[in-house]
């Protein structure tokens, strides 16, 4: 089944609000085996809404809209779409009664006149109950089987109605043994998109007939495999086989799948090894500590940290010799190592991590340009350091430096099994 999505609202069109509805719909429909072939956004204008929905119906015969079902003058979705089907608008007594009861129960007063508009619906439509808000959804279908579902634009309401009503209805219309859309995401760190493509070779074009998408972000590059044409019973097995082929090529850079978070994975690994951890941060300014402590239960592993931004703090709080900083500079391998060793000894932990770098936009030199970062990891006295040149703005460099530190901890653990690979960011 093919469907098009039309999201409605001036706030979306002008960029004041991020359209999270379309992304959520696409993910949920893909899991159901429904293919989204096009997404469109239009403003709160009746002609634009009618044109966008009419064109979508002509292509697929099935459209989901979000937005424009509220009580104000700019909520034009229902009459605009009713006009496409040649339907008039009528007051639905049951919807009106529900609205009146809702206002009396929740707010203790009668329904405002403006909200009566929400009880106006296209003739011959099916009302879709909305237990998450005031605006009901609408299902409108013609004699040729073409249909439009209108959902509220408020994300919480839209998601609730999708789960309560729309997905069960569509599930009955999707062939039980037909092809489904399934995907598998492998998460990588410390390697660039181009370097991944080079290592994958022909697999970068697709694996066993499945397309492979490269999705770069601050966490690293995600590799997403998608099966479009297999029944549900075969898709997962095919994805597992394809993922195994990718792991053969770039497995040392893969730290997880799906929504796996590297910070959470490292905390779990530390707990399994009965190791505690402390961090010493300069350019990241506490970002690594924040990522770790944002995870429930992190207090069992994370003992503390030091934000050693000034050189004097590096010396006073972490024991980094002032003469070392003078000789090598604050952004150097010896200083990063001393920070990791110093914070581990200060907090009495099994692991110490030190990060020092130049996040920019100022402070770079030809020898140490903006983005230069040194990360050191001390695991029970075994200290290893890596230099990286990270791209991006100040926030991106700081975030990627924290991610690099987590990945170096992962590699420190993996070296026990012989994995001593260094990613693309290494510079010396």
UniProtKB/Swiss-Prot annotation:
Q: Which SMART domains match?
A: MoCF_biosynth
Q: Which domain of life is it from?
A: Bacteria
The UniProt entry, under InterPro entries, shows: CinA, CinA-like_C, CinA_C, CinA_KH, Competence-induced_CinA, MoaB/Mog-like_dom_sf, MoaB/Mog_dom
Q: Which Pfam families match?
A: CinA, CinA_KH, MoCF_biosynth
Quote the NCBIfam families the UniProt record gives.
cinA_nterm, PncC_domain, PRK00549.1
Family, according to the entry, reads as follows:
Belongs to the CinA family.
Protein name (Swiss-Prot/TrEMBL): CinA-like protein
UniProt source species: Gemmatimonas aurantiaca (strain DSM 14586 / JCM 11422 / NBRC 100505 / T-27)
């Amino acid at each position: 089944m093919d469907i098009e999505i039309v999201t409605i609202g001036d706030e979306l069109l002008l960029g004041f609000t991020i359209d999270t509805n379309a992304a959520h719909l696409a993910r949920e429909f893909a899991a159901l085996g429904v293919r989204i072939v096009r997404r469109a956004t239009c403003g709160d204008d009746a002609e634009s809404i009618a044109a966008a929905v009419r064109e979508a119906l002509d292509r697929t015969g099935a459209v989901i809209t979000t937005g424009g079902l509220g009580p104000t003058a700019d909520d034009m979705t229902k009459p605009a779409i009713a006009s496409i089907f040649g339907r008039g608008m009528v007051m639905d007594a049951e919807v009106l009664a529900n609205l009146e009861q809702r206002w009396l129960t929740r707010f203790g007063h009668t329904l405002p006149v403006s909200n009566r508009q929400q009880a106006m619906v296209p003739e011959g439509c099916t009302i879709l109950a909305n237990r998450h808000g005031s605006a009901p959804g609408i299902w409108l279908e013609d004699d040729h089987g073409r249909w439009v579902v209108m959902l509220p634009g408020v994300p919480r309401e839209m998601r609730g109605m999708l789960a309560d009503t729309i997905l069960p209805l569509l599930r009955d219309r999707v062939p039980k043994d037909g092809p489904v859309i399934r995907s598998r995401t492998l998460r990588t760190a410390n390697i660039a998109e181009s370097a991944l493509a080079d290592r994958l070779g022909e697999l970068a074009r697709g694996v066993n007939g499945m397309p492979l998408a490269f999705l770069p972000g601050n966490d690293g590059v995600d590799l997403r495999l998608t099966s479009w044409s297999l029944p549900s019973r075969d898709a997962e097995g095919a994805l597992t086989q394809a993922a195994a082929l990718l792991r053969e090529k770039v497995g040392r850079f893969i730290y997880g799948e799906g929504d796996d978070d590297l910070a959470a994975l490292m905390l779990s690994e530390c707990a399994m090894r009965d190791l505690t951890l402390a961090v010493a941060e300069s350019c990241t300014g506490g970002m690594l500590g924040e990522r770790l402590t944002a995870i429930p239960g992190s207090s069992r592993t994370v003992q503390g940290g030091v934000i050693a931004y000034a050189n004097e703090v590096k010396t006073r709080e972490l024991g980094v010799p002032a003469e070392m900083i003078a000789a090598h500079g604050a952004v150097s391998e010896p200083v990063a190592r001393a920070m990791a060793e110093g914070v581990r000894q200060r907090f009495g932990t099994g692991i110490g991590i030190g990060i020092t770098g130049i996040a920019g936009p100022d402070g770079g030199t030809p020898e140490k340009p903006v983005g230069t970062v040194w990360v050191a990891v001390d695991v029970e006295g075994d200290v290893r350091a890596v230099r990286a040149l990270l791209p991006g703005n100040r926030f991106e460099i700081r975030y990627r430096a924290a991610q690099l530190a987590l990945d170096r901890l992962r590699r420190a653990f993996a070296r026990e099994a012989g994995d001593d690979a260094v990613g693309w960011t290494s510079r010396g």
